[in-house]
Amino acid sequence: MVVVGLGNPGPRYAFTRHNVGFLFLDFLKSKDWKTEKYFAWSRIKLAGNDVALVKPLTYMNLSGLAMPHVLKFFNASPDDIIVVYDDVSLKLGRIRIRKKGSDGGHNGMKSIIQALGTQEIKRIRVGIGDKPEGMDLVDFVLGEFSDEEWIILNKVFEVMKEALEVILIEGTEKAMSIYNSLEVRV
């Protein structure tokens, strides 16, 4: 399995809502990242399986540029990938696991679907909440989480780790049935 967390590279974006994919991978493994031309990567053991963690080093909207290189490097197919990314249409504390689907208006996922030529890509969408009324969407997703939001997000990351283990052991459908209805609260 290759878990691809979406985000923007560099310290300016490190802790923004849009970088929730990168943040989750850092939650799983914060050290020992290696860098290739288009992506950073590491490996972990999860539920007894070797799992590759990948952060595309292109900017979010160009995430797909890294994917052919990722597939070749890990000798993987689109079926081996799970993409993790932010979703403003989901409340903070919620996740949605899907086996396939459209980009849902997310430009990073759109780029990946275009690059791989398929919508048959597993994904975990991470709720980052509704933007405040009157706030620009870009400003919201490129804003940082509050201290209270971090408490929820860390609990969400624990749940996401469990969900990945279920995907590995029992399959995506089982994980969907367990985790898509959960809401993490403080």
From Swiss-Prot:
Catalytic activity: an N-acyl-L-alpha-aminoacyl-tRNA + H2O = an N-acyl-L-amino acid + a tRNA + H(+)
Entries under PROSITE patterns matching the protein: PEPT_TRNA_HYDROL_1, PEPT_TRNA_HYDROL_2
Residues where tRNA binds: Y13, Y59, N61, N107
BP GO terms, sorted: protein quality control for misfolded or incompletely synthesized proteins; rescue of stalled ribosome
Positions marked as site (Stabilizes the basic form of H active site to accept a proton): D86
GO CC annotation, single: cytoplasm
Primary residence: cytoplasm
Annotated site (Discriminates between blocked and unblocked aminoacyl-tRNA): N8
GO molecular function: peptidyl-tRNA hydrolase activity; tRNA binding
Highest taxon above the source species: Bacteria
UniProt keywords, alphabetically: Cytoplasm, Hydrolase, RNA-binding, tRNA-binding
Enzyme Commission number(s) from the entry: 3.1.1.29
Active-site residue list: H18
Location of this chain's protein in the cell: Cytoplasm
Pfam families linked to this entry: Pept_tRNA_hydro
Main EC class the enzyme belongs to: hydrolase
Family: Belongs to the PTH family.
Subunit structure: Monomer.
Function as written in the Swiss-Prot or TrEMBL entry: Hydrolyzes ribosome-free peptidyl-tRNAs (with 1 or more amino acids incorporated), which drop off the ribosome during protein synthesis, or as a result of ribosome stalling. Catalyzes the release of premature peptidyl moieties from peptidyl-tRNA molecules trapped in stalled 50S ribosomal subunits, and thus maintains levels of free tRNAs and 50S ribosomes.
HAMAP family with a match to the protein in the record: Pept_tRNA_hydro_bact (MF_00083)
NCBIfam families with a match to the protein in the record: pth
UniProt name for this protein: Peptidyl-tRNA hydrolase
Species classification: Bacteria, Thermotogati, Thermotogota, Thermotogae, Thermotogales
Gene this protein is translated from: pth
